[in-house]
Amino acid sequence: MAKTSMKAREAKRAQLVTKYAEKRLALKAIISAPATSEEDRWDAVLKLQALPRDSSLSRKRNRCSQTGRPHGFLRKFGLSRIKLREATMRGEVPGLRKASW
């Protein structure tokens, strides 16, 4: 079980990512556009650096919705492999069952 503070930190990061997504995308478009002048590009770089560090999508970590476990996360279900197996064995995941061949 992950600490409550880690879960809260990840929730805050997710909020920041959605809040600054449009602004970050616009600045990156200015930076990567070949027609942009050097001065405008430099201003965009400085503005991008001034944004909160946690607003970057690469800082967000996928976590299990039940336990907060960061490893063994399956996106399709939003659970870690351990909790997914437990739910499958209880028959709570439709269309999913233990493999047998």
Swiss-Prot record:
<keyword id="KW-0687">Ribonucleoprotein</keyword>
<keyword id="KW-0694">RNA-binding</keyword>
<dbReference type="GO" id="GO:0005737">
    <property type="term" value="C:cytoplasm"/>
</dbReference>
<keyword id="KW-0689">Ribosomal protein</keyword>
<dbReference type="InterPro" id="IPR023036">
    <property type="entry name" value="Ribosomal_uS14_bac/plastid"/>
</dbReference>
<dbReference type="GO" id="GO:0019843">
    <property type="term" value="F:rRNA binding"/>
</dbReference>
<comment type="subunit">
    <text>Part of the 30S ribosomal subunit. Contacts proteins S3 and S10.</text>
</comment>
<dbReference type="InterPro" id="IPR018271">
    <property type="entry name" value="Ribosomal_uS14_CS"/>
</dbReference>
<dbReference type="GO" id="GO:0003735">
    <property type="term" value="F:structural constituent of ribosome"/>
</dbReference>
<keyword id="KW-0699">rRNA-binding</keyword>
<dbReference type="InterPro" id="IPR001209">
    <property type="entry name" value="Ribosomal_uS14"/>
</dbReference>
<comment type="similarity">
    <text>Belongs to the universal ribosomal protein uS14 family.</text>
</comment>
<dbReference type="GO" id="GO:0006412">
    <property type="term" value="P:translation"/>
</dbReference>
<comment type="function">
    <text>Binds 16S rRNA, required for the assembly of 30S particles and may also be responsible for determining the conformation of the 16S rRNA at the A site.</text>
</comment>
<dbReference type="Pfam" id="PF00253">
    <property type="entry name" value="Ribosomal_S14"/>
</dbReference>
<protein>
    <recommendedName>
        <fullName>Small ribosomal subunit protein uS14</fullName>
    </recommendedName>
</protein>
<dbReference type="GO" id="GO:0015935">
    <property type="term" value="C:small ribosomal subunit"/>
</dbReference>
